[in-house]
Amino acid sequence: MNLNLKKLIAAIMVPAMLLTSAACSSESDAEITTPAEVTVDVTTPEESEQVSEESSPVDSSSENTQTEKTEKTSETTKTEETEETTEFSEVSSEETTTFAEETTTASTTAATSATTTTTAATTTAEATSTATKTTEATTTSAAAATTAATTTKPAETASAPTTSPVSGMRQITTMELVREMGVGINLGNTLESCHVTWISNPTVSSFETAWGSPIITEDIIKGYAKCGFGVLRIPVAWSNLMSADYTIHPDYMARVKQIVDWTLDSGMYAIVNIHYDSGWWSEFPTNKEKCMKKYTRIWEQISEAFKDYPDKLMFESLNEEGGWESLWNRWSGSTNGKAESFGILNEINQKFVDIVRSAGGNNPKRHLLIAGYNTDIELTCDSLFVMPSDKENRCAVSVHYYTPSTFCILEEDADWGKAKTDWGSAEDVKELTDNLNKVKAHFIDKGIPVIMGEYGVSTGNKTPEMIRLFLSSVAKEAYSRQICPVLWDITNVFYDRQQCNFKDGELLRQILAAKS
C-alpha cells in the first residue's frame, strides 16, 4: 500500500480521538523522566547542507516531501550521573528552547490534542492527506481466474525451540518465530508523530501525545496482551529529538526502550522500525549519500541500545516509504526509472541487515523484518524487489493490506474513486485470496516468512458488521497462509487506551479466531 492513502485513514479517524487525558488505572505508577534541564537548539540536522526545501506532508498539496535543511554539527555530552546540556534540532524552527523536565505518572497525564487539517488530493489512484501517518493504498488487480484460489492451512510448529548459547536467542527459524507471533496490533499515531510545529517546547511526551494519544502506560501495553495479541508493532519517528550529527536524544531512546520493555514483559513480541520520520526519505534519489548517512546512524544507535534484548524484539528496516515516484510512477505506463527506484530500496534493506549484524550482542542472530516496495503486495512481488543477503537466514518480508482502497480508505467520493461502504461479494473475496496467494507463492513457498505489518479500514461510513467481516477475513486468510496479520490501530478506534480494552468484543473474537 502506498503511503499517501493511509494518511486519509488516520485523518478521518483522528478528530474523534483527540483526547485530553489518560484515565487508565494502573497497579503501579509508570514514570517518564527526562534530564532536569536540557537545552534544545531547534534546528534541523540538515540545515548546513542547503538541501532545497520541499513542502511538508501536512501541506495537502505536496507528495510526502519535507524540508531536509542544512546540517549543523553539535557536540553532545552524555554522562550517567550529571545533567546534560545538548544542542538538539527539531523540524522547521531556529529558535532556542528549553527541554524541560517531564515527570509523568500513569494516573495523571495530559495528552496534547492536535487539530489536523485534512485534504484529500490525489491523482491516479492516490489520496494525499494529513494529520497522521501516510500510506499509499493501491487496489491490486485480481487474477483472471474465474474461481477463488484455495489454500491448505499449514501445520503448526511441531516442537518448542531450544535456547542458543547467546542469551535470549533461541534456535528457532524466522518462519517458526513469525508463526509464534499469532496476530498483532499497531501502537499507531504515538511515537511516530512528527511535523508538530504547533508545539513550542518539544519534549518526549509532547511528541507522544501530539496526534491524540494519551501518555502510554504499562497498563495500556498489558491490555493488548490481555486481549490476546501476540505482537505489538511500535512505529517510531526518530528525528523528533535528534542532534545535528544524527544523535538520538537519550530520553527519546529511553522512552522507546521503556515501551518495548513493557511489551516484552507482557509476553508479546515487539517490532520497532523507522516510520516515515518527517519525510527525509523523499530525498534518497537526489541526495542518497546524506540520507544513507542518517539512516546508518539511526540503526547503529538502535542496534546498540537494544543489542542485549532477546529474539522477541524484531527490527523492521522502514515503513512504507521505500518507493520513489520522482523516479518511477507505476500509473504512468512507463518503466523509466523503475529499476533505479527498486535498486535504492534494495540497497537500503541490505545496509539495514549489514548494520544490525555487525552491531554485537544478540544482533548477529536477531530476526529482521524487511520492508517491501511501498509494502505493496503487487510491487513487493515484482522481480526487481530483492531480499537482502543474510548469512543467518533470519529475515522476513513486510507487506501491508488496504485493498480495495475505495473501501479501506474512502469515506466519501473522491476524484479517483467512489467510496464503497460494503465488502464481501464473491469478487471481493477472490481479490483478497488472489493477493494473498500471490504473496504465499512468491515468499512463503520459497521459505521466506511474511508479516502483514498493517491492515485496516476506515470506520466512518461502514457498519460494525462490514468492519468485522473485512478485518476478520483478512486476518483469517493471512494466518491460514502462515502470514502474521498486524492490525493498524490508532487511539481509541479499536483499542480503548483509557479503559485498556478492545472496544468491539465481537470484532476481537473474530480476529483471534483466525488462529483456530
Regions found by a protein language model. Give the residues of each.
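Substrate-binding cleft of secreted/luminal carbohydrate-active enzymes
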Residues: 427-504
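Acidic/histidine-rich helix-loop elements
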Residues: 188-216, 244-248, 287, 406-432
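N-terminal carbohydrate-binding accessory modules
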Residues: 154, 158-231
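Extracellular mucin-like PTS domains
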Residues: 34, 38-163
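Active-site region of glycoside hydrolase catalytic domains
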Residues: 292-428, 437-457, 480-483
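C-terminal motif of bacterial Sec signal peptides marking the signal peptidase cleavage site
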Residues: 20-23
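An active-site-proximal structural segment forming one wall of the substrate-binding cleft
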Residues: 211-232, 242, 246-276, 283-317, ...
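Bacterial lipoprotein signal-peptidase II cleavage site
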Residues: 25-32
